[in-house]
């Protein structure tokens, strides 16, 4: 982001916090923390909605793409959702393209074999929930803000 765009986002975040009687982030680190905490709590909100649509339990959350490289966000997401977060692959789009080519060429027979190939080829990182009680309290507060 350009500096001007970044300033706009920071101003919007600070205004939202002030309007909702929340601590106003002043430093860059505080703004980033505010964003990451908000993302992690929003992921939980979406996950809870999705759980209501599926009869199967969700045992882990898989994060792919560029965001999967951010260990702090992945840990906070695991904390917020209360289940392990499995991060990676970061280049999911390119890998998906390669897997479709492998399927077409006969190197993979189905989705299961493609997943097995990816799991053997690309290291994934698992984040285990920590401080769940603190994050549960933060989530209840988050819901009151929405």
Stretches with model-predicted labels:
Residues 1-5, 9:
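Single conserved hydrophobic/aromatic residue that forms the stacking wall/gate
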Residues 12, 16, 138-141:
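Charge-rich, solvent-exposed alpha-helical interaction surfaces
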Residues 13-28:
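A short small-residue
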Residues 22, 35, 123-136:
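Short, flexible active-site recognition loops that position polar ligands and cofactors
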Residues 24-35, 65-69, 90:
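Secondary-structure capping and boundary motifs in well-ordered enzyme cores
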Residues 31-59:
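Phosphate/ATP-binding catalytic cores across multiple sugar-kinase/actin-like superfamilies
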Residues 49-130:
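Catalytic phosphate/nucleotide-handling subdomain of diverse soluble enzymes
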């Amino acid at each position: 982001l350009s500096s001007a765009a970044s300033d706009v986002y920071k101003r919007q975040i600070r205004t939202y916090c002030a309007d909702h009687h929340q601590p106003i982030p002043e430093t860059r680190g505080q703004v980033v923390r505010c964003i990451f905490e908000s993302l992690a709590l929003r992921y939980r909100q979406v996950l809870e909605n999705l759980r209501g649509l599926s009869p199967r339990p969700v045992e882990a959350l898989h994060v792919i793409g560029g965001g999967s490289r951010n260990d702090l966000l992945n840990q906070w997401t695991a904390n917020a959702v209360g289940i392990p977060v499995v991060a990676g692959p970061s280049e999911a789009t390119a890998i998906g393209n390669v897997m479709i080519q492998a399927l077409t060429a006969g190197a993979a027979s189905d989705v299961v074999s493609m997943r097995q190939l990816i799991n053997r080829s690309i290291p994934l990182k698992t984040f285990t929930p920590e401080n769940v009680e603190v994050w549960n309290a933060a989530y209840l507060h988050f819901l009151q803000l929405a």
